[in-house]
Amino acid sequence: MDIQYTEEQELLRSSVQRLLRDQYDFDARRKIVASEEGFSCKRWEAFAELGLLAAPFSEEVGGLGGGSLSTMIIMQEFGRHLVVEPFVETIVVAGSLIEQTGSEKQKRAFLPDIIAGKKIWALAWTEKASRFDLAKVTTTAHREGKDYVLTGEKSAVIAAPWADYLIVSARASGQRHDRGGVSLFVVDRRAANLHLQSFKTIDGRRAAEISLGGVRGQLLGKEGEGVAALEACRDHAIGALCAEAVGAMGELNSVTLEYSKTRKQFGTTIGSFQVLQHRMVDMFIAHQEALSLMQHLNLSLSADDAGLSRLASGAKSKIGYAGRFIADQAVQLHGGMGMTDELNVGHFFKRISSINIQFGDPAYHVLRYAQLDAAA
């Protein structure tokens, strides 16, 4: 598949490439990850100034109306540069949930600060026993006045240590697996009775275990419609993550090819060995297949096609397996230095591994694809 970008989309891509080339090389990224905060406010502000944070949102809420295709363009470049700032968590996930399900008052209250880069958000939906099931929620919510009071625990909440606000899934009614009982709530990350234990993920980002001991939150959207909102949001998040993975895979192929032209063994460059040439061809094919599937998914997201969830699961599984294959081979072809901190190859491997388990690993999505296909 070969997407023909519009003039505006080409301008967006070249602007992102120029910004990251000037401000986000590998050494700069290593310093950001090693810092106490783990991300750069300066870069986040630069993303806002360039309009990247506004790009996916509709013009009605102050965005640029670029939709999922602008997200795809941005995330591919972010993947090539291993950007750690929480674009998916804040813009693609939280921002879209607010835009699609929030009241007009909530949109006016929250979206301008998100688009301006003033506030960071995170989605707290995973629990220790939930695996990847959006409806498997034990955190509870009961009404108290105009607000709700939330009690429970959330696990591995990406970007939570950076966040100003959280969107939390909690059960207001029904049993543990009841889809209709789950709702979404906006919670101030610094609210009373909210305890957060931060940790560093394998790819250098930050996440947290969250304990809610009677925390006040406001309902986002309609009560009992949280799972449906999360399912739609998950498809868009998968589109963004697949674009990031494809960008990372392309960069891995490029650096591995260049390395094979300079690294000498047995008196010649390793790229002259036919068996390694065949392996790099396999890597190239895997990337091209993943690229086409990712583009197809994001075009479908833009058109809101039928069968979207099935396509998202198919893409997540196929691209996940392709990414792991390319990352494995890149490390092997670089030898022992492939996993050193000084070389970007190992960092790409870690990021692709992390993407693979966000919103469901490849094995989960193979099963989900089969279930959706059978039900079609």
What residues fall within each predicted segment?
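Cytochrome P450 C-terminal beta-domain/meander region
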Residues: D133-T151
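N-terminal glycine-rich flavin-associated loop
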Residues: E85-K105
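Flexible, small-/acidic-enriched active-site or ligand-binding loops
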Residues: K136-T138, A156, D188-K222
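A short core secondary-structure module
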Residues: T151-L194
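Alpha-helical interface subdomain recognition
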Residues: M1-L82, T101-K105, D113, G117-K118, ...
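A short, Trp-centered hydrophobic/proline-enriched beta-strand micro-motif
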Residues: G117-K128
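Short beta-strand-to-turn element immediately C-terminal to the catalytic PLP-Schiff-base lysine
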Residues: Q100-G102, H142, V168-R171, V186-D188, ...
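Short Gly/Pro-enriched turn/cap motifs at secondary-structure boundaries
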Residues: F87, A129-F132, A156-I158, R176, ...
